């Protein structure tokens, strides 16, 4: 078979025209040194700050330090097998994590990967971990309550949806318990909860997850865990991953609550990373931008305006203090960023007052607007009464004889302190709180021994539910106490006292 010359040339031309050259240019660099979860890389000239890279062993990394001749990259993994001379590839993208309904009920790591052995998460959407906080015009002032189910908080330091309320105290004062109680209390309220564990022991996180499962709270909760054994880079990323997941629900006109447990360990992880990256240390060896580290995180919690769907993201950051010192660097930073703080005290905890909330130092700067009218009515003077009681209590230690009015005030104060005690993992509905605080502030408990206050509390709820169910129903629907309802309530309390105490 003979080919004509022009046929051959036309075939060659056709092949050349249809030749599809798929050339992908990859920019790679070489590791100069690697230690403590940080790699120094030479050769990535065009890399961006915060850009993702891939190492030879498959681990991902994030570029944080851009220097003249090298790039400081934190390794988002174990970093096993990485050595000098290994190649590093630019991925030309920023870090994204999965968001959406598929994550609810799951335990994930700081990159959004499942670590609960329940299979793959099929997320429909991924979002950038570093997002800019919403501006002023996109927001609305906090006006809806977020009930924690804890009497002392809902009455004295109320939290609103979209608020940032700090929980601060020494170790072993019940900070995590307050946060977990708040999550349990959101059952049936349509609030998606995110619990971010930073630098915690795995056993502690497992305990929290177990507690949430026992109370059916994992049905609406996502747990993000960067444990004590995880690299500092993952501990640094975990809160940003959590808030990104929370923002998805907020932006879709839903309500979300996020707990950061705790930001002291987060700051320590960031300090560790910064020092290894040779960034200049400042006060307490923290880098200069440690304030920005937390402010950009906490500013992402907000209440959106009606045009954007009126969704909200409430943040409960936790800070651990040393010997009650709230004037240390990180505590003062976070106090100045948040809209109030709940201060837990070791002395109160040890004396059996639990939750160990110091009413004098705890404050909610915006939550008052979110409190329902009924709670406002019954707890209006409670903070002042408790403050006067504490003052009088200190004075009574030295004075042997007190006048009648002071003695009555002391006795009322003792009953109110007893009334605000609450066992862990047993949040109370608002209507029950209103009934109980009404009984205390209106003097119905003055003739009951302090040791029997718990008995009164345990009995009054089932009694009203059985004999006067309309009281709870009216508080729920009206969200306020009118004179008729107050009369009914007083009558029911007196009836219970006469028959059961």
Curated annotation (Swiss-Prot):
**Main localization of the protein?**
membrane
What keywords are assigned to this protein? ATP synthesis, ATP-binding, Cell inner membrane, Cell membrane, CF(1), Hydrogen ion transport, Ion transport, Membrane, Nucleotide-binding, Translocase, Transport
Task: Look up the coiled coil feature and give its residue ranges.
Answer: none
Q: Site annotation (Required for activity): which residues?
A: 362
Question: Which reaction(s) does its UniProt entry say it catalyses?
Answer: ATP + H2O + 4 H(+)(in) = ADP + phosphate + 5 H(+)(out)
Membrane topology per record: Peripheral membrane protein
Signal sequence span per UniProt?
Answer: none
Localization terms from the record: Cell inner membrane
Disulfide bond positions? none
Stored InterPro entries: ATP_synth_asu-like_sf, ATP_synth_asu_C, ATP_synth_asu_C_sf, ATP_synth_F1_a_nt-bd_dom, ATP_synth_F1_asu, ATPase_a/bsu_AS, ATPase_F1/V1/A1_a/bsu_N, ATPase_F1/V1/A1_a/bsu_N_sf
EC number annotated for this UniProt entry:
7.1.2.2
Give me the residues that bind ATP, please: 169-176
Q: Pfam families given for it?
A: ATP-synt_ab, ATP-synt_ab_C, ATP-synt_ab_N
One GO cellular component this record assigns the protein to is: proton-transporting ATP synthase complex
Q: Name one GO molecular function term.
A: proton-transporting ATP synthase activity, rotational mechanism
Assembly and oligomerization: F-type ATPases have 2 components, CF(1) - the catalytic core - and CF(0) - the membrane proton channel. CF(1) has five subunits: alpha(3), beta(3), gamma(1), delta(1), epsilon(1). CF(0) has three main subunits: a(1), b(2) and c(9-12). The alpha and beta chains form an alternating ring which encloses part of the gamma chain. CF(1) is attached to CF(0) by a central stalk formed by the gamma and epsilon chains, while a peripheral stalk is formed by the delta and b chains.
The UniProt entry, under HAMAP family, shows: ATP_synth_alpha_bact
Q: Which family does it belong to?
A: Belongs to the ATPase alpha/beta chains family.
**Which NCBIfam families is this protein grouped with?**
atpA, PRK13343.1
| Reported function | Produces ATP from ADP in the presence of a proton gradient across the membrane. The alpha chain is a regulatory subunit.
Q: What is this protein called?
A: ATP synthase subunit alpha
Q: Which species does the entry assign this protein to?
A: Campylobacter jejuni subsp. jejuni serotype O:2 (strain ATCC 700819 / NCTC 11168)
Q: What is the lineage of its organism?
A: Bacteria, Pseudomonadati, Campylobacterota, Epsilonproteobacteria, Campylobacterales
